[in-house]
Amino acid sequence: MKMTRTLRIWGGFLLLLLLLFVFLIWNIFAGSVSLSASEIWRILLGSDAGFTQSQIIMKIRLPRLLSALILGGALSLSGYLLQTFFHNPIAGPFVLGISSGAKMTVCVAMLALLSRGKTTSSAILIAAAFVGAMVSMDFVLLISQRVKRMSLLVVCGVMIGYICSALTDFLVTFADDSSIVNLHNWSLGSFSGMSWDNVKTMAVVCGITLLLAFLLSKPIRAYQLGEVYAQNMGVPLRAFRTALILLSSVLSACVTAFAGPISFVGIAVPHLMKSLFKSAEPLCMIPACFLGGGVFCLFCDLIARTAFAPTEVSISSVTAVFGAPIVIYMMIHRKAA
């Protein structure tokens, strides 16, 4: 039995790594400008290649696919941590209004800076998104203390998201034309326009958060078995819950700051990983969710770029098309069980 479980886990990770390799290669080749395998290989090795071709690979496609990988993993891991915290299978940064709160404060920061002719830095956007995520999370926590049914908590989270979105739209109404264009493109959700500085920043933020999540794997497992059990195992519940909130908020804030609000990844991918690995062990699920989220977003970004080329679809629309049916199936299957 243990051998079968081990083989399943290794098989699951091998499948994810294979899919990751396939989508990385596919994303490098996909685009309006066709490049041969030999050209791409020379560019990656730093050999002599055309300036235009080199710029396309090194300045556009590589930063974009790495951003999709990192931010997709961050969003999926954030959803897993929130589902653990609330003991709710459909908890996620988008559903609970956390992404919308981050979107609102990033909008405020962008408007304030752009109206003064200043550029927006990664640090400012992440800080603004984190503040918005924490404000929304505080409202959700306040409601969770008064509402016993998790279905009502989700509805309240959706309402918080609508309020934040309405306030964001209100702010955009009074913005100047140039700011509206920037905000509109960002608010639709996209991995385009990423720079290597953006990639480095998100890699550091998400990498540290991923490491901290690994350090919490034992307390998470104890918490999954019940709060009483966790207390008996010596888990400081208040500090542990605070850590989960902070980690999930940092992850969702980082995603929103760079790529805008992206839906359903944080809900759908953790359930896909649980079904694939047949395990709820945090030591397995934390890397699986991060890797699975990256693969899922690479696939969705590929569809967004190529399905209606040269027109690009917002990444959030594509993740909703593929993620929503997974959530619906999961809820029906859970109800039947």
Regions found by a protein language model. Give the residues of each.
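Alpha-helical transmembrane segments in inner-membrane proteins
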Residues: 1-337
